[in-house]
Amino acid sequence: MTTVTIKPGAMVLADWADIWRGATIRIDPEAKAGVDAAAATVDRLIASGEAVYGLNTGFGKLAQTRIADDELATLQERLVLSHAAGIGEALDSRIVRLVMALKLASLGRGASGVRWTTIAAMQALLDADVLPVIPSQGSVGASGDLAPLAHMSAALIGAGEATWQGQRMPASDALAKAGLKPVQLGPKEGLALLNGTQTSTALALAGLFEVEAGFQAALVSGALSVDAAKGSVAPFDPRIHSLRGHPGQIDVAAALRGLLDGSGILSSHEGCEKIQDPYCLRCQPQVMGAVLDLLRQAGAVLEREANAVTDNPLIFTDTDEAISGGNFHAEPVAFAADQIAMAACEIGSICERRIALLTDPAVSGLPAFLTPNPGINSGFMIAHVTAAALVSENKQKAYPASVDSIPTSANQEDHVSMATHGAFRLLKMAENLHVVVGIELLCGAQGTDFHAGLTSSPTLETAKATLRKQVPAYGDDRYFATDIANARDLVTGRGLVADAGTLPGIA
């Protein structure tokens, strides 16, 4: 099992991808000195008697209410309990682990004022496989992801629900079974745990990684469709793409050339009368390249956000100050999530057009619906309809979340990002995308089978062989849903990407 050491402020996308895929999480012990220094600053601020937001005052609209020193621990505990107001289905355990890892990375920067013992308690939860149950609904993405992170924090203090070794139960029971004790929160700790963009960032990162899997598999399926339709490789000539200069476009064109290199099908129709291919074949570098640039841009934003400190107020140890700001506002995450959603839509859209092309004999020159005996067999007729349905569903889901805002907290929090809403949809969109790409893979493999005596490139034949281990070639009609699910799983598991060698991605 891979272990990712969280080095606050120095994490890269590949680290978060490893955590998403199940890596063990460890906080770097070298972060302790900075954390201890910030906690000491909090202690000095309280001892000074100065009113500091969130340390010895109420929260939000109640910030003018001063809290007595003997009630500071109660203040933090009640903050957690009152803000644990989420609803809806629980987030997947992989998301919860990612949320907790992101929170460790943020707290470990030494600008939040929590004690190292509280960070160690979060680490202990992860080590013992005690994961808070976090409802998926209830955050507007400012002031941070308050409700989801309150549910995460509640498990630390023995409130709410958690899972232990996959079993859902009261958090107090989960802690007991794991041999752990509830945390007694110190000054500012509840606020530091609740305030931040870690839930929306975790959801957006997960969506990014899964859409990237769909993107890379779609390069394989798109290349296979070129061979199935006896399309041309000429539009992928590097000279075309260098004249436009977009990095993603250049990278995608190179990838398609590599995937099709050595194809016997391509060489069999050199000099044919067909002048130009339809856009869904010919313009893959332009469309998928723009998608790649968009995903890379979103990835860069999320990488920065994952390294950020996003609670409030922030603690500056060099001057012993606590300064209130607005790093909790998740607008960058909201924009990134919207970009990822757009990218998922476009990948699926161009894949669906190639499915339509391959199943239409008037355009592809292949048997109707890719069945050797049309009429008695319907072939890929309804598989295409399924792809069309999912592509349209993704279009509906892609409406930008970031353009929405609604005031909350008695108008103190009067502009919000909706980042969590925007990021939550991404995994479902990615799942839909994986199905669509899987269907195109099936169509492309079936289409190339009709070119008797000819083979595709060595790379594509290897990918096709991997697919055929899960889904045999089609003769007469058979139950289709299982084949689609198996093809989808190959996309999700990146099995075909491994066959294809190095393909361009977000990093």
From Swiss-Prot:
List of residues that carry 2,3-didehydroalanine (Ser): 143
SUPFAM superfamilies membership: L-aspartase-like
Transmembrane segments annotated in the record for this chain: none
Reaction catalyzed: L-histidine = trans-urocanate + NH4(+)
Cross-link (5-imidazolinone (Ala-Gly)): 142-144
Compartment(s): Cytoplasm
PTM annotation, UniProt: Contains an active site 4-methylidene-imidazol-5-one (MIO), which is formed autocatalytically by cyclization and dehydration of residues Ala-Ser-Gly.
Metabolic or biological pathway: Amino-acid degradation; L-histidine degradation into L-glutamate; N-formimidoyl-L-glutamate from L-histidine: step 1/3
One family name in Pfam for this protein: Lyase_aromatic
Highest taxon above the source species: Bacteria
InterPro entries per the UniProt record, alphabetical: Aromatic_Lyase (IPR001106), Fumarase/histidase_N (IPR024083), HutH (IPR005921), L-Aspartase-like (IPR008948), Phe/His_NH3-lyase_AS (IPR022313)
Enzyme class: lyase
Source lineage: Bacteria, Pseudomonadati, Pseudomonadota, Alphaproteobacteria, Maricaulales
Protein name: Histidine ammonia-lyase
Keywords per UniProt: Cytoplasm, Histidine metabolism, Lyase
Family stated for the protein in its record: Belongs to the PAL/histidase family.
Gene Ontology CC terms: cytoplasm
GO molecular function: histidine ammonia-lyase activity
EC number, as in UniProt: 4.3.1.3
HAMAP family reported for this sequence: His_ammonia_lyase (MF_00229)
Source species: Maricaulis maris (strain MCS10)
Listed CDD domains: PAL-HAL
GO biological process, one term: L-histidine catabolic process to glutamate and formate
UniProt cross-references to PROSITE patterns, sorted A to Z: PAL_HISTIDASE
